[in-house]
Amino acid sequence: MGVVIGIDVGGSTTKIIGVENKSIQSPMFVKATDPVTSLFGAFGKYIYDNGITLPEIEMVMLTGVGSAFIDQPLYGLPTAKTDEFLANGLGAKYTASLENLIVVSMGTGTSFVKVEGPHIQHIGGLGVGGG
């Protein structure tokens, strides 16, 4: 099984992680004013800094407001998009090892997500801010 790359293309910052053997690897943050530039810059820097080759990448998962600008696979790799609130809920549940929690995501926008076991619900706020 290869590396899954997760990328949150935000309005001001792109966040990227790798997941290998169910372990989160080397979170990275990249700032750029253009989401496509930020995405490709973060992706290139991440795989270079971590010594990951393209054939080692199993999947690229995208989320965030900037992911709307991407309509084709990254470098021919399997690429999919997921809802940002779902990603926030699942990520927090996994990281915290909790079944029930409220997730507050504070960036240029602030959102609230409720996690109750397998159910994840956006309960308020926005994922997109004003800068």
Residue ranges and their predicted role:
Residues 32-39, 81, 85, 126, ...:
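Generic structural signal for well-ordered, non-membrane alpha-helical segments
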